[in-house]
Amino acid sequence: MKLLLFTALVLVVISLIEVEAENERACIPLEKECTKTPGNCCSGLKCDCYRRFEQGVAKGVQCWCIEKDVTYKGV
């Protein structure tokens, strides 16, 4: 009986530690790169990706945290 209670207590403590660690994960602020972690922008922001070209040659994709309801157009 004591072993069962001890095991349950350990599981509860581990679960609480995991939840706390997830809540403390830092979000990515406005206009910072989110290419590797697209779901980690701060609240009110979205991760928007663009394909980058240099002299007509694709050089990869880059993503940035931007405001959700804002649309950017090329100049």
UniProtKB/Swiss-Prot annotation:
InterPro entries: Spider_toxin_CSTX_knottin
PTM characteristics: Contains 4 disulfide bonds.
Location of this chain's protein in the cell: Secreted
Keyword flag Ribosomal protein: no
Tissues in which the UniProt entry reports expression: Expressed by the venom gland.
CC terms in the record's Gene Ontology section: extracellular region
UniProt entry keywords in alphabetical sequence: Disulfide bond, Secreted, Signal, Toxin
Signal peptide: 1-21
Molecular function in Gene Ontology: toxin activity
Chief subcellular location: secreted
Prosegment location in residue numbers: 22-25
Keyword hit for Secreted: yes
Similarity remark: Belongs to the neurotoxin 19 (CSTX) family. 06 (U6-Lctx) subfamily.
Protein name: U6-lycotoxin-Ls1g
Lineage: Eukaryota, Metazoa, Ecdysozoa, Arthropoda, Chelicerata
